Structures are given as structure tokens and as C-alpha cells.
UniProtKB/Swiss-Prot annotation:
One of its GO terms (biological process) is protein catabolic process. Residues 616-760 are annotated as: Disordered. Homohexamer. It comes from Mycobacterium tuberculosis (strain CDC 1551 / Oshkosh). The gene is ftsH. Residues 1-5, 132-760 are cytoplasmic. Pfam families: AAA, AAA_lid_3, FtsH_ext, Peptidase_M41. This is ATP-dependent zinc metalloprotease FtsH. PROSITE patterns: AAA (PS00674).
């Protein structure tokens, strides 16, 4: 509700109130009479001070016009009072005895007045209903709750293209095909292919699902409607289904077009999830959505794109082919994707020579595009805070720590004893991890308080991993228990600083036993299954499906794993106690140590052998024959380059060609001056179209076309300065920044899975 409508509503209410007050004020004929007690009126009658009187029989009130005012009437010559029921005759006789002029009025009541008593409150309620409905976004008449709230993007909005997306090439390729189908349908129709009716983007928060939808909107060249899943359900019954019908009706009138529903899980949750009666309104909305997506009605030319963080709770009928033909996972970027994202966000920012983006990409395993964008932005803010002019490597390092652990607590006062305990604790983590053979090397260790932690040691993997062996998970347990072992070894008692380490170790050990089947005693069995009751989103949580004896054995195996890791960490620290003291001293002096400094301190530390106490295969004896070598390993042995160069996908080449053409057109247009509307004179901006009459372009690139649009009657003149129909976008050349990004908007959730510090 804008300011103009608010002013108009307030003015209307004020006018109604003023008219009502004026009506009651001017219709009151008792104005000018002073109210007095009945005894005062009787005194005036008995004192023969009454000139005339009027008895209002219906209201049981007496009006007197006195001959002269006095103190009892405060000098007023007109008084009015009430009299008891049945005393009208006595008053008439008393006034007649004093020779006063007496008149009697019997008010029969006005039909209009009686109607106002009942109608006016009703009108007031209707007015309030209309006002609140407008404030909630209803139609102008106040009864448009069933109208769709979808927004249609216009050409004036900022355009996002596939060139602005990096790190999620698979998702871009899938969506690019839809855009290409809309612009070049003949190539697909010749093969009998049909365009997908629906596309579901799913993945963790911050991976770029909404950004991909914005890129489709900027490149599709057809009308694009966007709406949130929560906009369908309202306080009134039937509103959600009505809005779904209205949305698809608008889409059919503008077909071919695209509808984007963000957070579709708000309306697409599995049916039957109403505990104690259910949420029939949401289910009714979902049923209408299912019918509109694939029912008896015609839905030609309408493509539905939806995004969600929780595809597991969506209704199966919503996910079937014919509704969502294509389901695209949008996951966290890999190493190459993180490099591309960092190049995108660092483009246009002054970066110092020591700002190693490749190294930063290696140290940010598990971060999403939104996290990486936040890292670059935090580094820029930190540089501005220090009045710097270029973003340095230390600023990027501090930005990563801020994103992972929170801001540094500079004002915290720590005693020398607590600082010493923290140094030995973090040193125990670092030394235990350094001596283990199957764990990522420690990149940095610090005792600076940050967020809720007193310090942390960061282990950075050399490459992205999708699998972990049992030895690697045991090494993680040793890493986690290193801090607790150092406290017990040096100070002879533990502290509360290891609470997060114990929690992490317990989680790893229990998952090894109950999920991954890494216990020889319990076997390769998954203990605890998720039941499919849909009352809380499809699952009521994990429930034990094993006996109490098995639960006791699980606890024993978990305890056995943690105790073995604790003992291994203790032995490492005992063997290299002098190295631990040296490391703690360096931490107390410098507070933060990086890989080169750690390598010099741990020069004499040797890798420990793997723990074999859990390598029990029963009667199954592993083979001594080594596994075969991969083509990459064989190529490296032969001295051949690996990995072999992979040809660039066709869609990337098309994106590069279109972007280069668009940039060339803009550079040519910049040399010819500018018109009154801000576009170059004699040329047209990429994405603008002109016909005999004005036609919207919906954020399309120059030269776009789609089936059925523009209308055949439209004539489009050709312009010499306009590029040929191409596909926008541009992959980054070697050594240059890629203009893409895979981060999503800031309203997306930032709770992601990433490498966590071992000590909290």
C-alpha cells in the first residue's frame, strides 16, 4: 500500500467521521439548555419563575424557560432535567397552576434515525474490511484476495544472464537448453522433442538457485512471472487455489512464458501432513497446483521453474514426470567452481599481488557461492576499515576466519594461565593431526578468541573428497582428541574447553558404527531408520529399531573408538612432548602460526603407522594383489600431461560468442553519442526491441525470438548497429576474471556444511 493510497484512505475516514459528527451535532435540539437536577426544576416551578415549559414524554425530560436566571441555574434561563416515570401529569398540573405556557411533545422516532443506528456500524465494519484488505495487498476494490501476487519482470529491471553464473556449469547447461528451445524450437521439434514442462532446482542454501532463475529470466526472451510459495496461502479459505488458477490464467494469456516459484516447499509439502485435522487449505492449494501443472486443461507454452532447499518433503505427485520433468541439483562448487566464483567477485576490486585466489579456493572447501561472495565483501570492508587502498592476502585470510568462526573478540581479557591452557590445547590438536598419516595437513593454528571459540586449528584438504576411509575417520578422531590429551598430559586435569571436541568425536564415532558399518563386531548394518510418517514433514525423526542389547553394544563400540583415538593422541604428545612445548611457546608469542612455520617446528615429527586394531574382517582375508591403475596414473607414469584437455561445451561457446557480440555493440554505440532516453543514438541497447508499436522485451537479448512472439502483424526493421541473434554470456579466458557467479541472494539461508575448526 503506497503513500498515495494511505493518504486517500485516511482522508476518506476523516470525512466519514466528520459527517457523522455533524449529523448528530446539528440534529440535537437540546443545545443551549443547561442540565440541572430535578429538585432545582421543581424549585423554579414552585417559585413561579417559569415562563414556558415543554414536556418530552418519550424521553421523560422537562425543558424550562425561566423568567430570570439565578444562582441555582448558574444564570442560565434555559434548563433541562429528567423526571420519573408517571409524573408527567403532576408536572403539567403544577405548571398550569403557575399560569406557565406548557407544551407536550411525543416523539414517535424517525425511521432514518433507526436505520442509522443499525446501518452505520455495519458500514464502518465494511470500510475497515476494505481498508485492511488493501493493506494486505488485495485488489483495488478490496475483494481481490484470490488474485495472483506474481510479479512480471519488465525490461527496466536489472538483467542477470548466464554469464553472471559460475561454479554450477551442469545446472547452467540444463537451463540453457530450455532457453535455447524457446528461441530455436525448430531444431528440437525436428527430432520430436518436447520442452520440459517443469524444472525443479534443489540444493543447499546459498548455492545459486534463485540466481539461476534470474539468469533464465534475463535470457529467456519471454514473459517471466515470479512468486514465492508462501504467497499462495492466506488467512481465507480457498484463496490459495484461486491464486494458483489466476496465476496460470495470466501465464496462458502471455504464453510462451515462464513461471518461477521460489521456496515451493511452502505449498508443495507432502499431503496428509496435518497432525490432528490437517491443513486443508494448503492441501487444496497443492491439489490445484497439481491440476494446473498436468491436468485436463491446456498448458501449452507455460514452463514452471521452482526452487527449494528440501526436496525430500515435497509431494511425490508434484515430482513426477509431466509436472517436474527435470530435477536439477545445485550443489556446493568444487575447486574449479570456487576459483571461478572468487574471480567473479574480485573482478573490479583492487587486489594485491599477494592475494592468492587459487590458494583461497583450496582453503574454502564446503563453502557455497554466497559464502565466497561474503568472503570477498568482508575483505573489502576490512580493507576500508583500515583505510587501505588494495585488498591484501591477510585481509582475505581474516575474512575467511570471520565467515567461519565469527569476528575476533579483541576486548576479551584472558588470564595468562587460561592463555597457556589454550596454547597447549590447540598445540595438541595440531601435533596429533601432523603425526597421523590419513588426515589433511594443518594449514593454520591460532589462540585468538573468535566467536564462541578460544582458538582453533584448521585442517585444509588438498583436494575435494567425496569418500572417506575408516583410517581417515579414525585420524579425525585422533585430531579431535588431541586437545583433551594435551590438557591431561601437561596440566594433569581436563578443562571445559574440549566440549566441542568431544561432541564432534562422538558424532564421528557413532556414525562409523551405526551408519557406515565400520564396526567388525556389529557388522555392515545400519542401526536406526527414518520412518515415513508425514506428520512433521514426512518423517517423525530417527527411531531405534534394535534391541537394548544392541544399543549397549553400539555404546561400547563408540566408546572403544574414542578411547583408542584418545590413547593414540596421548602417545603422540608423550613422544613429542618437547615439540609440543615449542609449539605452545610459539603460539603464546605469535598467537597465530601458518603452514611454513609449522613445517619448521615439526621437522622431526614422523608419521605414525595406521591403527590396525579395527581391521577385523572375520573369516574374510583381503587380497594381497594391488588394485589396477587408473588412466591418469598410467599417463603420469608415461610422462604424459594429465588431466587431458577437455573441449569446451557447446553452450559455453555460444555464451562467449553472444557476450563478445554484445560488448562489441556497446563499444560501437558508445562512440556514436547518446539519445534522449540514455541509449546510444542510432543504435539500440542489447535487449531492446522496436516494432511498429512498442513491444515489451522481457529482458531479452538482441535478436531474440520465440514461438508465437512477437505477433505476426508486428514488423521489425533491421538496424545496422544491431548484432546478429546470439547467446549472451562469456566464460573467463585464461588468466582473466570470469564474469559469472554462483552465489544466491542474501535473503538465502547461510547455514551450510563446511570445514569446521576442531576446537570450539
Amino acid at each position: 500500500m503506497n503513500r498515495k493510497n494511505v493518504t486517500r484512505t485516511i482522508t476518506a475516514i476523516a470525512v466519514v467521521v466528520l459527517l457523522g459528527w455533524s449529523f448528530f451535532y446539528f440534529s440535537d435540539d437540546t443545545r443551549g439548555y443547561k442540565p440541572v437536577d430535578t429538585s432545582v426544576a421543581i424549585t423554579q416551578i414552585n417559585g413561579d419563575n417559569v415562563k414556558s415549559a415543554q414536556i418530552d414524554d418519550r424521553e421523560q425530560q422537562l425543558r424550562l424557560i425561566l423568567k430570570k436566571g439565578n444562582n441555582e441555574t448558574d444564570g442560565s434561563e434555559k434548563v433541562i432535567t429528567k423526571y420519573p416515570t408517571g409524573y408527567a401529569v403532576d408536572l403539567f398540573n403544577a405548571l398550569s397552576a403557575k399560569n406557565a405556557k406548557v407544551s407536550t411533545v411525543v416523539n414517535q422516532g424517525s425511521i432514518l434515525g433507526e436505520l442509522l443506528v443499525y446501518v452505520l456500524p455495519l458500514l464502518l465494519l465494511v470500510g475497515l474490511f476494505v481498508m485492511f484488505s488493501r493493506m494486505q495487498g488485495g485488489a483495488r476494490m478490496g475483494f481481490g484476495f484470490g488474485k495472483s501476487r506474481a510479479k512480471q519482470l519488465s525490461k527496466d529491471m536489472p538483467k542477470t544472464t548466464f554469464a553472471d553464473v559460475a561454479g554450477v556449469d551442469e545446472a547452467v547447461e540444463e537451463l540453457y537448453e530450455i532457453k535455447d528451445f524457446l528461441q530455436n524450437p525448430s531444431r528440437y521439434q525436428a527430432l520430436g522433442a518436447k520442452i520440459p514442462k517443469g524444472v525443479l532446482l534443489y540444493g543447499p542454501p546459498g548455492t545459486g538457485k534463485t540466481l539461476l532463475a534470474r539468469a533464465v529470466a534475463g535470457e529467456a526472451g519471454v514473459p517471466f512471472f515470479t512468486i514465492s510459495g508462501s504467497d499462495f496461502v492466506e488467512m481465507f479459505v480457498g484463496v490459495g487455489a484461486s491464486r494458483v488458477r489466476d496465476l496460470f490464467e495470466q501465464a496462458k494469456q502471455n504464453s510462451p512464458c515462464i513461471i518461477f516459484v521460489d521456496e515451493i516447499d511452502a505449498v508443495g509439502r507432502q499431503r496428509g501432513a496435518g497432525l490432528g485435522g490437517g491443513h486443508d487449505e494448503r492441501e487444496q492449494t497443492l491439489n490445484q497446483l497439481l491440476v494446473e501443472m498436468d491436468g485436463f486443461g491446456d498448458r501449452a507454452g507455460v514452463i514452471l521453474i521452482a526452487a527449494t532447499n528440501r526436496p525430500d518433503i515435497l509431494d511425490p505427485a508434484l515430482l513426477r514426470p509431466g509436472r517436474f520433468d527435470r530435477q536439477i541439483p545445485v550443489s556446493n562448487p568444487d575447486l574449479a567452481g570456487r576459483r571461478a566464483v572468487l574471480r567473479v567477485h574480485s573482478k573490479g576490486k583492487p587486489m594485491a599481488a599477494d592475494a592468492d585466489l587459487d590458494g583461497l579456493a583450496k582453503r574454502t572447501v564446503g563453502m557455497t557461492g554466497a559464502d565466497l561472495a561474503n568472503v570477498i565483501n568482508e575483505a573489502a570492508l576490512l580493507t576500508a576499515r583500515e583505510n587501505g587502498t588494495i585488498i591484501t592476502g591477510p585481509a582475505l585470510e581474516e575474512a575467511v576466519d570471520r565467515v567461519i568462526g565469527g569476528p575476533r573478540r579483541k576486548g576479551r581479557i584472558i588470564s595468562e594461565q587460561e592463555k597457556k591452557i589454550t596454547a597447549y590445547h590447540e598445540g595438541g590438536h595440531t601435533l596429533a593431526a601432523w603425526a597421523m598419516p590419513d588426515i589433511e595437513p594443518i594449514y593454520k593454528v591460532t589462540i585468538l578468541a573468535r566467536g564462541r571459540t578460544g582458538g582453533h586449528a584448521v585442517a585444509v584438504p588438498e583436494e575435494d573428497k567425496g569418500l572417506r576411509t575408516r583410517s581417515e575417520m579414525i585420524a579425525q578422531l585422533v585430531f579431535a582428541m588431541g586437545g583433551r590429551a594435551a590438557e591431561e598430559l601437561v596440566f594433569r586435569e581436563p578443562t571445559t574447553g574440549a566440549v566441542s571436541d568431544i561432541e564432534q568425536a562422538t558424532k564421528i564415532a557413532r556414525s562409523m558404527v551405526t551408519e557406515f558399518g565400520m564396526s567388525s563386531k556389529l557388522g555392515a548394518v545400519k542401526y536406526g531408520s527414518e520412518h515415513g510418517d508425514p506428520f512433521l514433514g514426512r518423517t517423525m525423526g530417527t527411531q531405534p529399531d534394535y534391541s537394548h542389547e544392541v544399543a549397549r553394544e553400539i555404546d561400547e563400540e563408540v566408546r572403544k573408538l574414542i578411547e583408542a583415538a584418545h590413547t593414540e593422541a596421548w602417545e603422540i604428545l608423550t613422544e613429542y612432548r618437547d615439540v609440543l612445548d615449542t609449539l605452545a611457546g610459539e603460539l603464546l608469542e605469535k598467537e597465530t602460526l601458518h603452514r611454513p612455520e609449522l613445517e619448521s617446528i615439526f621437522a622431526d615429527v614422523e608419521k605414525r603407522p595406521r591403527l590396525t586394531m579395527f581391521d577385523d574382517f572375520g573369516g574374510r582375508i583381503p587380497s594381497d594383489k594391488p588394485p589396477i591403475k587408473t588412466p591418469g596414473e598410467l599417463a603420469i607414469e608415461r610422462g604424459e600431461p594429465w588431466p587431458q584437455p577437455v573441449p569446451e561445451p557447446a553452450f559455453k561457446a555460444a555464451i562467449a560468442q553472444a557476450t563478445q557480440a554484445a560488448e562489441a555493440a556497446r563499444s560501437d554505440a558508445g562512440q556514436t553519442g547518446h539519445g534522449a532516453n540514455g541509449s546510444p543514438a542510432g543504435t539500440h541497447r542489447s535487449g531492446d526491441r522496436q516494432y511498429g508499436s512498442t513491444q515489451p522485451d522481457y529482458g531479452a537479448p538482441a535478436g531474440w525470438h520465440a514461438p508465437g512472439w512477437p505477433p505476426r502483424s508486428s514488423h521489425r526493421p533491421s538496424y545496422s548497429g544491431e548484432p546478429a541473434p546470439t547467446y549472451p554470456g562469456q566464460p573467463y579466458p585464461t588468466g582473466q576474471a570470469d564474469p559469472g557467479s554462483d552465489e544466491s541472494s542474501a535473503e538465502q539461508d547461510d547455514e551450510v556444511s563446511r570445514t569446521k575448526p576442531a576446537h570450539g
